[in-house]
Amino acid sequence: MEKLETAAQSITWHVTSARWQVAREVAAVEYLMATLGSDRFLPPIGGWSVDYSVVAAVLDGALARGGPVHSLELGSGAGTPWFASVAKLTGGQHVAVEHNPVFVARTMALLEHYELLDFCTVVEAELTPGADGAEWYALAPITSRVSDGSVDVLVIDGPPASVGPQARRPALALLERLLADDALVVLDDVVRAEEQQTLAAWEQEYGDRLRVLPILDRAALFRLRSAAPSEGPQSGDEPDPTEEA
């Protein structure tokens, strides 16, 4: 009897959660349609790609920031035209990073179809082993197109989990210098244990500089403040003043 009650409670929780998820997505779609004002049928998203609520939160943050908003997306797909549309609305630019040549071609085809190529660049960056042996995007193709301190919004939806444990954890350490102060960051798929561990590790590493915004459920949304000058440069960033010229 106790097992049946537990099972019933679990089913009730999942049904309630699903109903709230549907309600959130409907509200997000209504906001996007009213605010983006697009007369095109952009590709449906959700499932493997980001949810509508993620794009809505990015759009809301972009409008609150004001001015041209430049965004960087790790992992391209159906969500890319949506982020490119946000960039178009604000007068900014979107850059999508993709390691798979097949998906690069598909994303480019989507952007061409929706006439968004002027507002989005797709960067092909292969996955290469780092010092710890874990694979991550080659940095050179990214940094050659994105300047330091220019990224207002970072969407982390890659590399895929199949790459290895906590595949997305290197993102902040490797890309922090590209971020503008108080940049908006999205970590997708936090329903998975590995992304939860990644977020927890970032919260510990960045402390008060990282402020989570409790708006989304399947993704984490937070702001990352730049390091204060008083915190000093990282080792090796500046020459030793005692060293002779």
Give each language-model segment a name.
Residues 1-53, 62:
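Rossmann-like AdoMet
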Residues 46-50, 73, 129-135, 160-165:
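Short, flexible loop segments at the rims of nucleotide/cofactor-binding pockets, characterized by
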Residues 159-245:
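C-terminal substrate-binding/active-site "lid" region of AdoMet-derived donor-dependent transferases
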Residues 126-144:
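Adenosine-cofactor binding site in Rossmann-like domains, unifying the SAM/SAH pocket
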Residues 145-153:
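A short acidic, Gly/Pro-enriched loop at the edge of an enzyme's catalytic core
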Residues 105-107, 132-133, 222:
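Short, charged, surface-exposed secondary-structure boundary motifs
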Residues 47-128:
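SAM cofactor-binding core of SAM-dependent methyltransferases
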Residues 72, 153-155, 186:
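Structural motif
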